[in-house]
């Protein structure tokens, strides 16, 4: 049987949500420069779309991390496969992620980056699944919240 996929949001709706988040970022960072940290690979297009709508000065860097290695199941150990090229000491950093569910990997990334003394460290995500959290991660900006459906007994 062929699976039917239903569109939840149109391209135009998503574009409008990106504009709304960019407007909030512009207000929150007025008079400051943002250093966007794009978590590879999933967030590349979201990060690019967001950066185009931000009017305050922006620089961008990339980080790739995995807790899976060559396994199908997470090992729980964070492996940085591509670290930042730039020093973030004293900079206002915005981590841009595509999907946040358990929060495990992102929590470890935040701890690693916080130890590098940024002036501020915030998180923006395209898709947030707070019901799936295994660790506490404060998401500052999210486009879409997905709640797990309640299962019937």
Model-derived features with residue positions:
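Short secondary-structure boundary/capping segments
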Residues: 6, 26-28, 52, 70, ...
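Short, glycine/charge-rich flexible loops or terminal/linker lids adjacent to PRPP-binding catalytic cores
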Residues: 18, 57-93, 104-107, 133-136
């Amino acid at each position: 049987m062929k699976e039917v996929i239903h569109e939840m949001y149109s391209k135009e709706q998503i574009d409008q949500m990106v504009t709304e988040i960019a407007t909030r970022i512009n207000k929150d960072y007025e008079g400051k420069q943002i250093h966007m940290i794009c978590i590879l690979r999933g967030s590349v297009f979201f990060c690019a779309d967001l950066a185009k709508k931000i009017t305050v000065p922006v620089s961008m860097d990339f980080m790739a991390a995995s807790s899976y290695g060559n396994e199908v199941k997470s090992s729980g150990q964070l492996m940085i496969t591509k670290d930042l090229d730039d020093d973030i000491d004293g900079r206002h950093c915005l981590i841009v992620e595509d999907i946040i569910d358990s929060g495990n990997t992102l929590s470890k990334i935040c701890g690693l980056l916080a130890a590098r003394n940024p002036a501020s460290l915030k998180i923006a995500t395209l898709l947030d699944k707070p019901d799936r959290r295994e660790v506490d991660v404060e998401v500052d900006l999210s486009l879409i919240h997905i709640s797990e459906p309640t299962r019937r007994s």
